[in-house]
């Protein structure tokens, strides 16, 4: 038996087998969790059903987080099928391409800001609020994926950095709000990983090289490492951890000065 046996978890954001969310689903399945999945784009529906089947799940639901009725429909379906929910993974983020390339101000606009914050940030507490009745009395856990670009200026990350900064704050406020119900809220800040989402960030390959050169472990990280950390945070083993941003980045966040050639 794994340490998530008996847990019912919802995973969002699985787009490919290179997604961090895929690594999370893989680890949670290994540890015995029962999983459900959502997708935001019909293009990925059939692919996701295939992934879900690998993890013993036939619960694959549409959920565009900009549409409250779709969130409500997921709540209704999971309530019918499971009754309760032991946690969810918020792996959702988007910013218009022009706002995550080049100079910050040149790509900055009101529309891009609204879009990035609505999809990437608002959706985390919105899902927590929607799922709250299902999570009460279950020592449940909420988990999101953030990035160091919400704390420090990272080239080209730009408007998404603003969204991640707000997402980090949302994690802390959710921890405070949900704690009285015994529900935890945390975030994983993974280092750069070659995912479909990351491919949209200009200069991403350079970020990988910088991390490999300067992270204390001298390498990048994998979706499996992020997944193992997520499985722990979603489990009762992490019962005393909430409001935390857990770095899975080979120690890169701890380095103040980059290594330079003599």
Regions found by a protein language model. Give the residues of each.
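Conserved mid-core segment of classical short-chain dehydrogenase/reductases
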Residues: 63-72, 76-81, 90-116, 155-159, ...
């Amino acid at each position: 038996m794994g340490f998530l046996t008996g847990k019912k978890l919802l995973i969002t954001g699985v787009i490919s087998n290179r997604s961090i969310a895929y690594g999370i689903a893989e680890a949670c399945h290994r540890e015995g969790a029962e999983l459900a999945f959502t997708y935001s784009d019909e293009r990925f529906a059939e692919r996701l059903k295939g992934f879900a089947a690998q993890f013993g799940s036939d619960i694959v639901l549409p959920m565009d987080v900009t549409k409250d009725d779709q969130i409500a429909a997921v709540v209704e379906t999971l309530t019918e099928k499971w009754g309760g929910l032991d946690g969810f993974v918020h792996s959702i983020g988007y910013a218009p391409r022009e706002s995550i390339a080049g100079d910050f101000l040149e790509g900055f606009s009101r529309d891009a800001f609204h879009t990035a914050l609505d999809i990437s940030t608002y959706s985390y507490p919105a899902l927590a609020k929607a799922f709250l009745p299902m999570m009460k009395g279950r020592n449940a856990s909420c988990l999101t994926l953030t990035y160091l670009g919400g704390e420090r200026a990272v080239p080209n990350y730009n408007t998404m950095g603003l969204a991640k900064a707000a997402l980090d704050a949302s994690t802390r406020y959710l921890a405070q709000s949900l704690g009285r119900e015994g529900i935890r809220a945390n975030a994983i800040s993974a280092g750069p990983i070659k995912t479909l989402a990351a491919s949209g960030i200009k200069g991403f390959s350079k970020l990988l090289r910088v991390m490999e050169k300067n992270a204390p472990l001298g390498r990048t990280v994998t979706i499996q490492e992020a997944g193992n950390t997520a499985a722990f945070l979603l489990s009762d083993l992490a019962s005393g951890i909430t409001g935390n941003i857990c770095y899975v980045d080979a120690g890169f966040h701890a380095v103040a000065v980059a290594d330079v050639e003599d």
